[in-house]
Every structure is written in C-alpha cells, then in structure tokens.
Amino acid sequence: MRFNPKARLDTRRTRDVGRSSGGGRSRSRLPSGSGRGRSSLPIPGGVAGGGGVVAVIIAVGFFVVTQLMGGGTGLDMGSGGSLDAGRFEDSDRYAACETGEDANESVDCARVAVENSLYDYWGDTLGSDFRPADSLVTFSGQVGTGCGSASSAVGPFYCPADDTIYLDSGFFDEVLERQLGGPDGGFVEAYVLAQEYGHHVQNVLGTIGRVRTQQGASSDAVRLELQADCYAGMWARGATATEDSSGTALFSELTDEDVRLALEAAASVGDDRIQQQTQGQVDKESWTHGSAEQRQRWFRVGFDGGDLDDCDTFAAGSL
C-alpha cells in the first residue's frame, strides 16, 4: 500500500485525545525500507449501542474482554449521551500530516489518508444519501463517547450515537498480534478502519436498526458484521480511484499482498478462531461476528465486484 506523494490530506475529521494518564503521543514512523509499512490495528471491532439504552456491545472486544481478560465489555453504558466535541482535548498527533508522502512515512498519517479515502469512496457510492462519519478518534486507556465510557479493552468500535469511530492504536499489538496471532502490515489497519466505516454506512442506511438477535451463527449481529466486511471489500476494490479534495488520487498502489493481509486479518478475528484459541472449543450459539471463512468470503464478495445489493447479508439464505 502506497499513497500518492502529491495528495493533500485533510485532518479535520481525525483526532487524538491522548493517553488517559495525560500527554499526547508522538508521531509514529513506518519502518525504513517498507513501502507497505507497518501497522498494528488488525481487529475490526463492532457497533456500540448508543444513548445508554442498549446494554450489549456487538464487538469482538466482547470476546476479547470476557475470554482473555475475564471482565465485562469495557463499555460503561451508564454514561451515554450525545457527543460533546468540546470535551475532547486534542493532541497534535496528526498536525504534521499534510501529504501522501507523509502517509507513506507515518502510521498516523496513513490513518488520515485512509479516512480521507473512505470519505471520498462512500460519498461517491451513496451520493445524496451520504453523511460522513463525524470523526475518527484515537485514544489510550479510556474515552467518553456518545455510547458511554469505553476502555481500551473494547477494541475499535463505531458509536452510532455520535457517528464516530474510536480506536486505541496500541491495543492491537497486545491483543490481536500477540495473543491471537493476527497479521502485521500496512493494509491491516486500513481494513479495520474500512470495516468500522462500514458500520457507519449501515447506520446511514438504517441497517443497524434491523438487529434483533445478538448471538448465534445466523444472528442479526453476525449478518451486520459480515456486511461491514463486505463493505470493506467494496472500498478496497475502489480505493485507488479515490481522490483528495482537489481531485488528486490518494493511492498510488494497492497490491495483492495488501489484500492478502486484509483477508488474513479477517480470518484471525473469526469467532471460531478466537474461541478455539481462548477456550479450546467452538460454540456457534455465542457467535457475534461470524467464522474466519465467512469473514474472508464476504470481504471477497465486496472486493470482487460486489455492490450494496450483493452485500445484503440480511437477505442471504446462507452466510
């Protein structure tokens, strides 16, 4: 994955609120000699219930917390409410992200570039129906959201109440890569962000409101997640055609290796893989995201030419 050095980045929708212990984070750099770069955000999380009403988080963080850490979901729904953007004290983490060249050199700036690409892709795809995600917010430790107070244990997630994607970029080194054996590579984080943006698209289209069953191999929760995987595949196919605000291409290269990394990341967070690794057996009745094979397959449906109708997992007889 490489970005067009001439592309201009828009940082207005990407914010960092720093560490819960205080202080911002430095601008991380990609390893030298790696055009595809390094990133450690391999887990696509899920959707958090908004407004303090829904007490269940439909996220892979649910499995991570309950099965790896022995706790709850990591989301305190009691403090839900609308997002007060003024409460964020932004660090300057993304201030130096100005061009595609910066994105080729910095994990942080690559994150901005991917957000810009998702914004452009879904704007073109949805047309007048499009409403952009309010923000991509990175944090460390804990953060207040429109869906409640969330800890790093939740993993990346989308909050419909404030139209915002949240992620702790350090969480995935520890959990997915080290504990679940997930892949490491530049396009892994891009896949994660695309999957979370897919949840925003579902919110825009009203699909999130169709979720009635929370667990099970054919549950609405699984269908929601697989559809977001399919949307991520759609974006990946069209990413090299996305542009900055002046019409300059954002990406200069997206390779087969990048797609392989996305598929590997999708498989590593399949419910069956997580359950087998964390509890030694598979329980389909408790699935919320789908199997490794399903996650890969639905990503491919989107990537191999699928459109919104092809990604309608709620209409699929077989997942």
Regions found by a protein language model. Name each.
Residues 173-191, 216-222:
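Short pre-active-site segment immediately N-terminal to the catalytic Zn-binding motif
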Residues 272-319:
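Pan-zinc metallopeptidase signature
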Residues 1-95:
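Long amphipathic alpha-helical segments used for membrane anchoring, targeting, substrate engagement
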Residues 97-120, 127-149, 249-255:
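Acidic helix-start/capping segments at beta-turn-to-alpha-helix junctions
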Residues 203-226:
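Post-HEXXH active-site segment of zinc metalloproteases
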Residues 109-115, 119, 125-127, 227-272:
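Short helix/loop segments within enzyme catalytic domains
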